């Protein structure tokens, strides 16, 4: 499995996980020139912007460690555009990271990651 396939698989796992928790998926791979958000979901009255990180092992660190300051800044920029475009200015939001551990077949959901 190449990195793209691992990422796509991890995103499917994350979507299914969020659905099982009662979330509604609003967008997948929401892209602008400045960046991308893997999943935008709604749970109750809150909009959740989710970055998914998949790993076969932790040889190069935990998945969440790869969400750098620069990456967070891009995600926040894309989220800001989404909020304005969809008139969600008064809606509570949060930024989550979902780590998918492929070999262990488990996930770790970090709510309010940044």
Swiss-Prot record:
InterPro entries: Restrct_endonuc-II-like, tRNA_endonuc-like_dom_sf, UPF0102_YraN-like. Pfam families: UPF0102. One of its GO terms (molecular function) is nucleic acid binding. CDD domains: PoNe_Nuclease (cd20736). Coiled coil: none annotated. It comes from the Bacteria. HAMAP family: UPF0102. Belongs to the UPF0102 family. This is UPF0102 protein CD630_12710. It comes from Clostridioides difficile (strain 630) (Peptoclostridium difficile). The lineage of its organism: Bacteria, Bacillati, Bacillota, Clostridia, Peptostreptococcales.
